[in-house]
Amino acid sequence: MGKRFSESAAKKAAGLARKRDQAHAKQRAQMEQLEAEEASKWEQGSRKENAKKLEEEQKRQEKARAKKERDALLTAEEEQLGKGGKGKRKMK
């Protein structure tokens, strides 16, 4: 004859619980590995600066510097010429 259910029920339940625990541990390990990989990708991404943004910032600074130079030249020229008075009126 065979074994009775009452004899093998505890053994079967223990085996299922062990398999369930192993599956949870495996899944937890996979999630931790994925999180570690994603964290390393974020770290690598944060190290590099965006080249396009750097170029735009450099252009903006260059434009601001050029404008300051133009303004300085304009004020120097105005000071050199002196304050302009009224011009001679032409008689008609």
UniProtKB/Swiss-Prot annotation:
Span list, region Disordered: 1-92
One Pfam family, short name: LSO1_2-like
Subcellular localization(s) per the UniProt record: Nucleus; Cytoplasm
Coiled-coil ranges (or none): 17-80
Description of what induces expression: Constitutively expressed. Expression is not regulated by iron unlike the LSO1 paralog.
Keyword field: Coiled coil, Cytoplasm, Nucleus
Chief location: nucleus
Bias kind Basic and acidic residues: ranges: 1-10, 38-72
Effect of inactivating the gene: Mild slow-growth phenotype in response to reduced iron levels. Displays global translation defects during recovery from stationary phase with translation of most genes reduced more than 4-fold. Ribosomes accumulated at start codons, were depleted from stop codons, and showed codon-specific changes in occupancy.
InterPro entries per UniProt: LSO1/2
GO molecular function: ribosome binding; translation repressor activity
Function: Ribosome-binding protein involved in ribosome hibernation by associating with translationally inactive ribosomes. Required for translational recovery after starvation from stationary phase. May facilitate rapid translation reactivation by stabilizing the recycling-competent state of inactive ribosomes.
Assembly notes: Associates with translationally inactive ribosomes in the nonrotated state. LSO2 bridges the decoding sites of the small with the GTPase activating center (GAC) of the large subunit. This position allows accommodation of the DOM34-dependent ribosome recycling system, which splits LSO2-containing ribosomes.
Similarity comment text for this entry: Belongs to the CCDC124 family.
Protein name: Protein LSO2
